[in-house]
């Protein structure tokens, strides 16, 4: 089903709005993927705050013009799924993890911070912990000495109470 010009303009505007707020765009090729698998991919993307769409490449090329993602335009060939996220690693993580489980999805390229990334670089980006994971690790590292000191004081107080 082809879109009329107004629908195409609306799609380009929607994608442009998503790209304006995004830090990362990852593209992956899909061939012969089952509907149930694509539905699972869409659900995982939604859970992780990733905007995921299958679009005409010409429409996406128009949407990326003048954005930091313009360098990906020459990679937009074939049946592609586009993952866009404001989180620097979420889009890469979702597509990379899904590609490991389903060989019909192949991560082709990505763009982060104005740089075009090849598939290996997208895999590296996907291996970086998310901001929330890093903050929780930092909090644990900061709390561990204080918690240990509190336990030592409690044990000392308990020992003195037994002695008295």
Swiss-Prot record:
Gene Ontology biological process terms in this record: translation
A Pfam family assignment: Ribosomal_L10
Family: Belongs to the universal ribosomal protein uL10 family.
Job description of the protein: Forms part of the ribosomal stalk, playing a central role in the interaction of the ribosome with GTP-bound translation factors.
Subunit structure: Part of the ribosomal stalk of the 50S ribosomal subunit. The N-terminus interacts with L11 and the large rRNA to form the base of the stalk. The C-terminus forms an elongated spine to which L12 dimers bind in a sequential fashion forming a multimeric L10(L12)X complex.
NCBIfam families with a match to the protein in the record: PRK00099.1-1
Protein name: Large ribosomal subunit protein uL10
């Amino acid at each position: 089903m082809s879109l009329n010009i107004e629908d195409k303009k609306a799609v380009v505007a929607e994608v442009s709005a998503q790209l304006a707020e995004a830090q990362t765009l990852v593209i992956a090729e899909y061939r012969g993927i089952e509907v149930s698998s694509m539905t699972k991919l869409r659900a995982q993307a939604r859970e992780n705050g990733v905007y995921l769409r299958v679009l005409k490449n010409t429409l996406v090329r128009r949407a990326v013009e003048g954005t930091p993602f313009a360098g990906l335009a020459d990679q937009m060939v074939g049946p592609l799924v586009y993952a866009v996220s404001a989180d620097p690693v979420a889009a890469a993580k979702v597509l990379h993890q899904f590609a490991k489980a389903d060989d019909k999805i192949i991560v082709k390229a990505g763009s982060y911070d104005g740089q075009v990334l090849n598939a290996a670089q997208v895999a590296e980006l996907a291996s970086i912990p998310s901001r929330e994971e890093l903050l929780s690790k930092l909090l644990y590292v900061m709390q561990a000495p204080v918690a240990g000191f509190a336990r030592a004081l409690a044990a000392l107080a308990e020992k003195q109470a037994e002695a008295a």
